[in-house]
Curated annotation (Swiss-Prot):
<feature type="domain" description="Globin">
    <location>
        <begin position="2"/>
        <end position="146"/>
    </location>
</feature>
<dbReference type="GO" id="GO:0042744">
    <property type="term" value="P:hydrogen peroxide catabolic process"/>
</dbReference>
<dbReference type="GO" id="GO:0019825">
    <property type="term" value="F:oxygen binding"/>
</dbReference>
<feature type="binding site" description="distal binding residue">
    <location>
        <position position="63"/>
    </location>
    <ligand>
        <name>heme b</name>
    </ligand>
</feature>
<comment type="subunit">
    <text>Heterotetramer of two alpha chains and two beta chains.</text>
</comment>
<dbReference type="GO" id="GO:0020037">
    <property type="term" value="F:heme binding"/>
</dbReference>
<feature type="modified residue" description="N6-acetyllysine">
    <location>
        <position position="144"/>
    </location>
</feature>
<keyword id="KW-0813">Transport</keyword>
<keyword id="KW-0408">Iron</keyword>
<keyword id="KW-0349">Heme</keyword>
<dbReference type="GO" id="GO:0046872">
    <property type="term" value="F:metal ion binding"/>
</dbReference>
<dbReference type="InterPro" id="IPR012292">
    <property type="entry name" value="Globin/Proto"/>
</dbReference>
<comment type="similarity">
    <text>Belongs to the globin family.</text>
</comment>
<dbReference type="GO" id="GO:0043177">
    <property type="term" value="F:organic acid binding"/>
</dbReference>
<dbReference type="GO" id="GO:0031721">
    <property type="term" value="F:hemoglobin alpha binding"/>
</dbReference>
<dbReference type="InterPro" id="IPR002337">
    <property type="entry name" value="Hemoglobin_b"/>
</dbReference>
<dbReference type="InterPro" id="IPR009050">
    <property type="entry name" value="Globin-like_sf"/>
</dbReference>
Length: 146
């Protein structure tokens, strides 16, 4: 993904303030609530019957944290997102059969979560930079799809 030096500084500066467990659980939880068809990939997570159940589900929180840890790896390797996400792309494509559109949806939800937590610090320039990053990550995760 191509970011200017200013965009990279915005992304890395804000990412350093991300509370991975909290924001990750919230982002994945919101995805599962707003786009309920994505729940089919999480059958083993137990109770996803309501928004409260999803948002309080410890497996959702744990997997959300894992997702954001991977996102952090991507942010450290913005010039090689495809390489960084190669194994995860393979896993989600070949074994889990996740619709790659879900990566885009989660990226957009994550941007909303960041905006909610960072308020005024999440400037229009920061949002634009993060939109580029989540689009790049979604494309990298979709790379192994045929």
């Amino acid at each position: 993904v191509h970011l200017t030096a200013e965009e990279k500084a915005l992304v890395t500066g804000l990412w350093g303030k991300v509370k991975v467990e909290e924001f990750g659980g919230e982002a994945l939880g919101r995805l599962l609530v707003v786009y309920p068809w994505t729940q089919r990939f999480f059958d083993s997570f137990g109770d996803l019957s309501s928004a409260d159940a999803v948002m309080g589900n410890p497996k959702v929180k744990a997997h959300g944290a894992k997702v954001l840890q991977s996102m952090g790896d991507g942010i450290k390797n913005l010039d090689n997102l495809k390489g960084t996400f190669s194994k995860l792309s393979e896993l989600h494509c070949d074994k889990l059969h996740v619709d790659p559109e879900n990566f885009r949806l989660l990226g957009n939800v994550l941007v909303c979560v960041l905006a909610r937590h960072f308020g005024k610090d999440f400037t229009p320039a920061a949002q634009a930079a993060f939109q580029k990053v989540v689009a790049g990550v979604a494309n990298a995760l979709a790379a192994k799809y045929h």
